Amino acid sequence: MNKTGIKALLAPKDCVLVLIDHQPFQFANLHSHEPTMVVNNVIGLAKTAKVFGVPTILTTVLEERGGLLIKGLQDVFPDQKPINRTFINTWEDSRVADAVKKTGRKKIIIAALWTEICLAMPVIQAFGDGSPRQLERNK
C-alpha cells in the first residue's frame, strides 16, 4: 500500500544519501546555476544528513584527473573516503550499490550536478532494482 499525506514524507531513519561527484572539474561547465550557490546547497544538504544521522555515501569519478571532492563537502565527513569510480553510471559500481544496500535504508536520496548523466542513470537503475528513491538536483 502506498503511503500518502504525512506518512509519505521522508524520515531520516528510512533514508540514505548518495552525493555523486561533487568535484571541482564537474563545476567547470556548470551554467544552469551559480556554482557558489550549488556548493553551499550541497554542503548544507550534507550537514543536514549528518545532523539527522542519515548515512551518506560520497563518490568521485576519475579522481586523479578531476580532483578530490570540493573542500567544504569533504570537511563534513573528514574521515570518510569517497568511492572513486570509473563507470559513468554510479549504480553500476558494485561498491556504491553495496554500500547503499548495507545501510538497510529503503529510501535513497541522490544528489548530483548533471541530471542527464550523474543523476538519471543511477536513479533509473536503482528504480529497476526496486529501490525507492528521492532525486535532488543540486541547485
What residue spans do the PLM features occupy?
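A generic structural motif
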Residues: 84, 138-139
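Active-site acidic carboxylates
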Residues: 1-87, 132
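Cofactor-binding loop segments of dinucleotide-utilizing enzymes, especially the Rossmann-like FAD-
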Residues: 61, 113, 138
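Short hydrophobic alpha-helical runs that function as membrane-insertion/retention elements
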Residues: 134-136
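Internal catalytic-core helix/loop-beta-alpha segment
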Residues: 85-131
